[in-house]
């Protein structure tokens, strides 16, 4: 019997996170801090609250992880030009230098996860995931 949707998504999430952790280990990164770097790359100057919205994590978890990444030299916090009470987050030279490897790992895991699906199925699957995520976001 097929598992329910939530169970399937939970297992898929765990498998992808485990695979990412394995591939990121030689870079001294984990799937958690990897995703922070990818978001900061796409939105340089993002605030911690903006990061929390994109990653869907609580503010205290974001603060701890951002502080850890800054201490490790992957990102830097600058005072926001728009709001002096907030920090704007940017990749450091070290963080920028590792991006090609992070992109390659992302592509590898995407290929592995979707290997049994045709291109049309992959596109449909991604659209369904997006629609499902938007449904939850809009339920506030």
Q: What do these predicted regions represent?
A:
Residues 1, 5, 32-33, 94, ...:
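N-terminal positioning helix adjacent to the helix-turn-helix/winged-helix DNA-binding module
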Residues 1-27, 74, 136:
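N-terminal leader segment of winged-helix/HTH proteins
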Residues 36-37:
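Short alpha-helical "packing" element that flanks the helix-turn-helix/winged-helix DNA-binding module
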Residues 48-49, 60, 67, 87:
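Residues within helix-turn-helix
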Residues 52:
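The alpha-helix within a helix-turn-helix
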